[in-house]
Amino acid sequence: MSSGKIAQVVGPVVDVMFASGDKLPEINNALIVYKDSDKKQKIVLEVALELGDGMVRTIAMESTDGLTRGLEVLDTGRAISVPVGKETLGRVFNVLGETIDLEEPFAEDVDRQPIHKKAPSFDELSTSSEILETGIKVIDLLAPYLKGGKVGLFGGAGVGKTVLIQELIHNIAQEHGGISVFTGVGERTREGNDLYWEMKESGVIEKTAMVFGQMNEPPGARMRVALTGLTIAEYFRDVEGQDVLLFIDNIFRFTQAGSEVSALLGRMPSAVGYQPTLATEMGQLQERITSTQKGSVTSIQAIYVPADDYTDPAPATAFAHLDSTTNLERKLTQMGIYPAVDPLASSSRALSPEIVGEEHYAVATEVQRVLQRYRELQDIIAILGMDELSDEEKTLVGRARRIQFFLSQNFNVAEQFTGLPGSYVPVAETVRGFKEILEGKYDDLPEDAFRSVGPIEDVIKKAEKMGF
C-alpha cells in the first residue's frame, strides 16, 4: 500500500502528494485517510486526475470537514468495492456499501465488486423485444416499457416523478415478483425514509436493495451512488441470471454533482455551466444498463427538467439513451389528472404492431389522434364556444374528454393520501376499455365517472352511483 500526504483541500476536492519514488495510484482507485489518531474516522477519496510530479487530485465521498494538510493517505490499490448478492436484499446502504438501516453491518466475507466496470461487449447483448406490463393505463397503452429497456420519467419539480416510481416498484414486486434496486441520487432524505417504511410495511423490501446518496451529501457521493446501485443490479443479472429493475431517482442530480466538482477539478465549464465531460459520464453509466444473454436490467430513471426546459443539456443528453419517455405535464396536475402523463409528448420504441400487436397499436394511435384533434379544437372552443362545432366534432370532444379522464387512475402508494384504493389494470383490459370508449359505447355516461378509476367496469359502477 503506497501512501501520500494531503497537499490541499478545496471543498470536496483533495490534492494528495505521493513521494517521487512511489507508484502513483491509478485513476478511480480508492484512497483512505483517517481523521483521527485512533483510526476510527476514515474518509474515502477517489482519484480523478493525475497532475504529475507525484500529485493526484481526488474527490471525497464524505464531508472533508476536519481534514488538514499533511494527513497520511493510503492507496487501497483498487476502486471502491460494494457488497453484492442476496445479502443486499432488504438492506439500505450508502455509496461505499456501508449499511445505514440501523441493522447489523455486512459480514467481512460478503461478495464485493468494484463500481467501475466496462459495459458488456456487443456479442453479449440480447436483442429480444418483450413488453413489461406496469398496470398503469396511460403507460401500458401509449408508451409501453420494454423489458431490458431504459425509461425516462421527465418532469419539473412536484409533478409526481417519485410517486410514479414508487407505484412501479409496488406493481412490479406484487405482480411480477422481480428483484428491484432503488438508487436515490441527490433527492430528499424524507422521501427515501418514507419509501423504506412503505416497502417494509408492504413486504416489497425483501425483494429490493436500496442505495442512497442524498441531497445533504457531498457531490462525490451523489456522483458515484448511481454506479453503486448499478453494480448490484449487474451482479443479479450476470451471476444469478435474474431480470432486474433498476430505479434511479434522480439522474439529473448525477449530472449536477459532476458539474459541482468539474470546475474544482480544473475543467473549463461547457454549455449552461455544465461539465465538458457531460456526454461521456452519462454514456459510461447508461451503456452498462442493458440486457445480456444471461438476464436483463430494465432501468426507470426520474429526470428532473430544470425550469421545465427540455433543451437544457442535462435532460437532452439523457434523452439520447432512452427507449421510452414518460413526460409529466404540470397542466395536467392543475386539472387534477394523476398520473400527470402527457399522452401526446410521451413516446416509446415499443409502440409498434410487431411488438404490441395490431389491435393495441390501432387503439393507441386512434386515442392519440382523438386527443390531438381535441387539442387543436380547444382554441376554437375557448373563443367561440362549443356551439360553433359540428355534431361530429362535438362527439369527438366528448370522447376525448372521457379518454383524458380515463387515462388517470388511483395509485396503491397514494391510498393513504387519497383514501381511495389503488388499481392495477392488465394491458388487455386497458386496450378493451379505450376501444369501447372510441366506439361510443359510453357516450351517455358523465365525464366525471371516468376520473381516477381502474378498468372500464369501475366507470360503469361509478356512473350507477351517480344515478346514471
Swiss-Prot record:
Short name of any one Pfam family annotated for the protein: ATP-synt_ab_N
Cellular compartments annotated: Cell membrane
Chief location: membrane
Lineage: superkingdom: Bacteria
One Gene Ontology cellular component: proton-transporting ATP synthase complex
MF terms (GO), sorted A to Z: ATP binding; ATP hydrolysis activity; proton-transporting ATP synthase activity, rotational mechanism
Entry-linked NCBIfam families: atpD
Record's protein name: ATP synthase subunit beta
Native source organism of the sequence: Streptococcus pyogenes serotype M3 (strain ATCC BAA-595 / MGAS315)
Taxonomic lineage of the native organism: Bacteria, Bacillati, Bacillota, Bacilli, Lactobacillales
